[in-house]
Curated annotation (Swiss-Prot):
It comes from the Bacteria. Signal peptide: none annotated. Pathway: Capsule biogenesis; capsule polysaccharide biosynthesis. It catalyses: N-acetyl-D-mannosamine + phosphoenolpyruvate + H2O = N-acetylneuraminate + phosphate. Residues 289-346 form the AFP-like domain. The gene is HS6.11. This is N-acetylneuraminate synthase. Its EC number is 2.5.1.56. Transferase involved in the biosynthesis of capsular polysaccharides. Catalyzes the condensation of N-acetyl-D-mannosamine (ManNAc) and phosphoenolpyruvate to generate N-acetylneuraminate (Neu5Ac). Keywords: Capsule biogenesis/degradation, Transferase.
Length: 346
């Protein structure tokens, strides 16, 4: 799986990573605020906007009214009731996003949510970490035959395997996202090597869905080969909400887009470890050649007493060959401080 296309966006290992700003529930249920955040992301250079599609009664049982997330003071049920957009408002948000030329992406947290997004005509699905091992829901969404970006936080390789099998069986193009689901995530729990483990285990494109408070983890992920980066997004860090603390604002988003492009260039595309041809101008003066360090008479044996290695590297014998010519006899008189050539000895 070398490439995924979502409308006009191409994701592969050669291009700069796709940066996904997630508005999520940062709009607190306000369509107008959601539009303001879309505008802010657009102004920063975003190509895509991610939302969360919550249909609470299909997503959660009443037991969720007793579960309070670690980054909140009210139950997850109450949070989602407050923040969910209904069909009309979400469709309006999707249309607004697309009028700006941006791709609308969302995470469904239920079968009804997935059906809503399919009915709206989305081009791809984002799967949250909590749904990574929700195999019935994964199968349901896979039936739509759309590309999927799948977060894998809180899951092990073993629990991810059934999801990947579903995707492969349905021939779904996908990216696996390493994630740590702590809001915010301390740097010592980012564990970027886990992203490499996903790539090794599943031979797929990978990315990072990050919940730290800066862009550092994302940039590190790019250096390691991330094709997709995701962070929560807000137009202002002064907003209220459980995800604001780990969100990026317009300035941070603009920086992440620009710096991730630069990091991808610095990473390169699987080049082997060898000198770049452009380095020749430096090689010429930085490398060393074999030179005489005193006058040498014809017939004299070359030794460490009369030859050594010195810059520049423009001589006939490189420093790497020094030991191979020790013990050879000079075929001519050689003046001190002369760069040797193979014609000088036998």
């Amino acid at each position: 799986m070398k490439e995924i296309k979502i409308q006009n966006i191409i994701i592969n290992e050669e291009k700069a990573p796709l940066v996904v700003p997630e508005i999520g529930i940062n709009h607190n249920g306000s369509l107008e605020l959601a539009k303001i955040m879309v505008d802010a992301a657009f102004s920063a250079g975003a190509k895509i906007i991610k939302h969360q599609t919550h249909i609470v009664e299909d997503e959660m049982s009443k037991a969720a009214k007793k579960v309070i997330p670690g980054n909140a003071k009210i139950s997850i049920y109450e949070i989602m009731q407050k923040c969910a957009l209904d069909y009309k408002d979400e469709l309006a948000l999707k249309e607004y996003t697309e009028k700006l030329g941006l791709v609308y992406l969302s995470t469904p947290f239920s079968r009804a949510g997935a059906n809503r997004l399919e009915d709206m005509g989305v081009s791809a699905f984002k799967i949250g970490s909590g749904e990574c091992n929700n195999y019935p829901l994964i199968k349901h969404i896979a039936a739509f035959k759309k590309p999927m970006i799948v977060s894998t936080g809180m899951n092990s390789i073993e629990s991810i395997k059934p999801t990947v099998k579903i995707l492969l069986d349905n021939e779904i193009p996908f990216v696996l996202m390493h994630t740590t689901n702590l809001y915010p995530t301390p740097h010592n729990l980012v564990r970027l090597n886990a992203m490499l483990e996903l790539k090794k285990e599943f031979s797929c494109m990978v990315g990072l869905s990050d919940h730290t408070t800066d862009n550092l983890a994302c940039l590190g992920a790019v250096a390691l080969g991330a094709c997709v980066l995701e962070r929560h997004f807000t137009d202002s860090m002064d907003r209220s909400g459980p995800d604001i603390v780990c969100s990026m604002d317009t300035k941070a988003l603009k920086e992440l887009i620009m710096q991730s492009e630069q990091m991808a260039i610095m990473r390169g595309n699987n080049e082997s470890k060898k000198a770049a041809k452009q380095e020749q101008v430096t090689i010429d003066f930085a490398f060393a050649s074999v030179v005489s360090i005193k006058d040498i008479k014809k017939g004299e044996v070359l030794s460490m007493d009369n030859i050594w290695v010195k810059r520049p590297g423009l001589g006939g014998i490189s420093a790497a060959e020094f030991e191979n010519i020790l013990g050879k006899k000079a075929l001519r008189d050689i003046e001190n401080d002369t760069q040797l050539s193979y014609e000088d000895f036998a």
